UniProtKB/Swiss-Prot annotation:
Belongs to the ABC transporter superfamily. Phosphate importer (TC 3.A.1.7) family. It is found in: Cell membrane. This is Phosphate import ATP-binding protein PstB 1. GO terms for cellular component: plasma membrane. Keywords: ATP-binding, Cell membrane, Membrane, Nucleotide-binding, Phosphate transport, Translocase, Transport. Part of the ABC transporter complex PstSACB involved in phosphate import. Responsible for energy coupling to the transport system. InterPro entries: AAA+_ATPase, ABC_transporter-like_ATP-bd, ABC_transporter-like_CS, P-loop_NTPase, PstB-like. It comes from Ligilactobacillus salivarius (strain UCC118) (Lactobacillus salivarius). It is a peripheral membrane protein.
């Protein structure tokens, strides 16, 4: 079946609800265009899932939200955070990433102790007081639901942790910088079901303090944890709505076919 990629439904939010917004976002890898006119608004203190087949543009889109594609892709359009376009050449990228953090698909702890994994960036940003560092380590590990498992082994190598623990450590490391927004690129795809459930539980708790945007291939996961869902296809955002509506009453036929498994 052929679909009209201009047939779209994109939910619009109230101005006060927005934590982040993209306007006419187009992304190119050389001459190949990977994203077409991406216009999305993300609500504060909610989880938004980005779904779609491999190569649909969702990870490319996610990485653009804190300029992780810089030097690899040509990004055109606006990404507005607190009313400021973070694509502006005047923006200090490293400073901006304190506010818009990233957790990658595979756990990537530093080959340092658990404690040093969290304090390394803090020290680089001028926090030297030992009591303050210890406080942030404890708070971050508690928010990532890891403190009780590692509190007596903070000097242990992070590489000795299980995969699920390593991923929660990476989440703790990211939130130690006190970001407003946390981007997660398939954070549970490399984990077993028990570790995945723990990550999902952690994310649901984190949205009380952070805005979360997550790429997932797992539609059941998207339906379980997200408030909003955006469906990507061939570099286009086809539908963006509240998750319940996406999964029970999609407005676009292409979305319906993808969700129901009748795609293609």
């Amino acid at each position: 079946m052929e679909y009209n990629l201009k047939d779209k439904y994109i939910l619009q939010l109230n101005e006060k609800e927005k934590a982040l917004e993209t306007r006419d976002l187009n992304i190119f890898y050389g001459e190949k265009q990977a994203l077409f006119d991406g216009n999305l608004q993300f609500e504060r203190y909610k989880i938004t899932s980005l779904i779609g087949a491999s190569g649909s543009g969702k990870s490319t889109f996610l990485r653009s939200l804190n300029r992780m594609n810089e030097g690899v892709a040509d990004v055109k359009g606006s990404i507005l955070y607190r009313g400021i376009d973070i694509n502006s050449p005047k923006i200090n990228v490293y400073e901006m990433r304190k506010y818009i953090g990233m957790v990658f698909q595979r756990p990537n702890p530093f080959s340092k102790s658990i404690y040093e994994n969290i304090t390394f960036a803090l020290k680089e940003n001028g926090i030297k007081d030992k009591e303050k560092l210890a406080e942030i380590v404890e708070t971050s590990l508690k928010q990532a639901a890891l403190w009780d498992e590692v509190k007596d082994d903070l000097n242990k190598s992070a590489l000795a942790l299980s995969g699920g623990q390593q991923q929660r450590l990476c989440i703790a490391r990211a939130i130690a910088m006190k970001p407003d927004i946390l981007l997660l690129d398939e954070p549970a795809s490399a984990l077993d079901p028990i570790s995945t459930a723990k990550i999902e539980e952690t994310l649901l708790e984190l949205k009380e303090k952070y805005t979360l945007i997550i790429v997932t291939h797992n539609m059941q996961q998207a339906s379980r944890i997200s408030d909003y869902t955006a469906f990507f296809h061939l570099g286009n955002v086809i539908e963006y709505n509240k998750t319940k509506n996406i999964f029970t009453n999609p407005k676009i036929k292409l979305t319906e076919d993808y969700i129901s498994g009748n795609f293609g």
